[in-house]
Amino acid sequence: MVPTTLLKVLKENTFLDDVATFYNNAGFQLYLVGGAVRDGILDIPTKDFDFTTDATADESLMLFKNNGYQTTEIGKAFGTIEALYENFSLHVTTFREDSYKDTSRKPEISSSNNLENDLKRRDFTINAIAYDLLENKLIDPYSGLKDLSQGVITTPVSADISFSDDPLRMLRACRFVSSHGFSPDSDTFEAIKKNIDRIEIVSNERIRDELNKLLIGDNPSLGIRAFVESGLSLKIMPELDKLKIEVDPKHHHKDVYEHTLIVVDRVSPNIVSRLAALLHDIGKPNTKGIDNGKVHFRHHEVVGARISEQILKRLKYSKKEIQDICLLVENHLRPHTFKMGWSCLLYTSPSPRD
């Protein structure tokens, strides 16, 4: 049975049925897949719709052009075309199967005439559900609906194979923890820990983009915990792990890391604010001192700004983003930051702020 939330998506976006109809009239199969199905079921709005089809990219381009749609050929080499309708973006990809070399996450693509094989190549079961719009039927060969209802992140094939093939999927799993509040099952999480070295073949730009999506999610602290506890942070942002330091030797409190997670959750969900929150105490491990049994972190904001700059340059952030984030990190203890909407960074924790 198709959830009413997904039916609502079709009712609100009647052009989707039109697209399915002109593909069907031309003798082609067409299925809605990926995030549109997942988020439609969860009643999360979207303006991006992904389809899979047995039509070639050229055939899809012709169909959309003949029906008055604007199109782009970005991704055509991978069997994907884009069509535009008002403020909506439609991506249509020919059924395919992917294979990978050990040294690259870029797949070698071969066409397929089999929907199930196309779904099998996808990152997680929650994204491997197809919807036949005209038949009003869900195709779910990998139990994605069950995982979606239980909030579980797992893979259509062996997680070990999936993450070795495309290591960025490991960070994407952490992103879904943040954006949707889901959790990897034990096998999936163990596979991430086992394959963290594979993340080194992924470009810093792709890592940055996925990290951004994690940070602007509704549950960023949960995503960061998964990022750290899986070991991925050691390969991408090892400075983060160093925040687990004692600030009260007598009671062995380790609250710099926990304080950081609280702050990240409290600030506005834009990437500059969230990154500044994540990095605002990054200088504390390098400035920790003890006088008369009391811990201090003198000038940690200045040191933190320098460390932040190194991290952000490594991850290929823009000069403007680096400047804005480092300015917030360096000034997060000053009163005028309240005027910048930055009071959350002055959250009072048991640790000294000096």
Could you say what each language-model-derived stretch is?
Residues 1-353:
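Catalytic cores of the polymerase beta-like nucleotidyltransferase superfamily
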